[in-house]
Amino acid sequence: EISECLVGSEMCIRDRNQIHFFGLDWIQSIGVKFIFKLDNISMILTALTSFVFLLASFASKFNIRTNHKFYYSMLMLLMSAILGIFTAGDMFVFFLFWELELIPAYFLIGGKWGVNENPMAQSSAIKFVLFTFLGSMVMLLGILLLHYYNFISNGILSAVFSDINSSSIPDYIQNLISICLLIGFGVKLPIIPLHTWLPDAHTNAPTPVSMILAGILLKTGAYGIYRFNYQTLEDAFITIAPILAVFALVNIIYTAFVAYAQTDIKRIVAYSSISNMGLVLLGLCAINQIGLSASVFHMVAHALVTCGLFMIAGIVYLRCKNRDINTLSGIAVVMPRLFGFAVVIVLASIGIPAFAPFISEILTMIGALNADFSDVLK
């Protein structure tokens, strides 16, 4: 059954030409169209988004006690922004939704929701917004350069992804654009050293928001790299991929050791998420079908496992008023059902065979080992 699922997912990803779209002209003078498209990868991620927000809404019942109308309106606005990112068919529409998500994310991370309010939550929210906004400005520069040079080189005044032909843009300009975009997406993924906002935001946010941050928000960075760098600026990405793969390995190894040194459950999961997103990035850097399939598969597997881990951390905190693993001995006696659930989720998170993360990690390694960087490294 697992092999059938893998073949099915690979065929789904391979067939990228089946795109359904709808939209309208927005700013005709510069070729911007308010257009939405669904290919197979964005379809997977939109379905994943809906499911994670469903889980977060369920968890909110136990973690949110005040300002319900405002909280759920921000939750739905954030969901709409993320779905807009995954379905945008135009670069500027993508950027519009990329910036729109900052507003609800700020209030959700830093808001006062009546249960176990964290005094550090607001400062964590500000840090998240500053990091993301500064990265977005660099990303916007890359989008503007891509839009301009696509017009200069091809005579096409359009910001629609399918109208961009980067092969006629000079190589050094492609590389510059690709780096600008990677900085913006690298904040959200995150790529070390642009990761310092994440542990604080994950730790200090309410449990449902932590589930969304790790389960979906990080995937917007990986999707941006796929949509812009991997798919649109393919030649530049082939050049940059070997260097980016080194950053991916640093993500995987360094943050795994940092996670090992933590005692707060949510902080452990936060650093573990950075390590797992390094695997996603490594799969993309392989630039082959196995790596791409593994990358998407691992995004889904990591989202589900991480939501489970944060849900466990939230339940433990609601019951024990504590997340320090050094003081939680004997919890299996007090909460045996939760303990059983936690054992399964933790085994999945560390990649035990037969669980989804194990399969995606093995496929990522196979994709990376089959990567051909010989032409680039000559």
Residue ranges and their predicted role:
Residues 1-8:
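Positively charged, low-complexity/disordered segments
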Residues 9-73, 153-162:
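Transmembrane helix-loop-helix hairpins at membrane boundaries of multipass inner-membrane proteins
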Residues 15-33, 120-125, 136-195, 200, ...:
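Juxtamembrane/interfacial segments at transmembrane-helix boundaries in multi-pass membrane proteins
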Residues 38-49, 92-104, 174-185, 235-249, ...:
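Structural signature of hydrophobic alpha-helical transmembrane segments
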Residues 74-77, 81-169, 258-271, 275-325:
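Alpha-helical multi-pass transmembrane bundles of energy-transducing inner-membrane proteins
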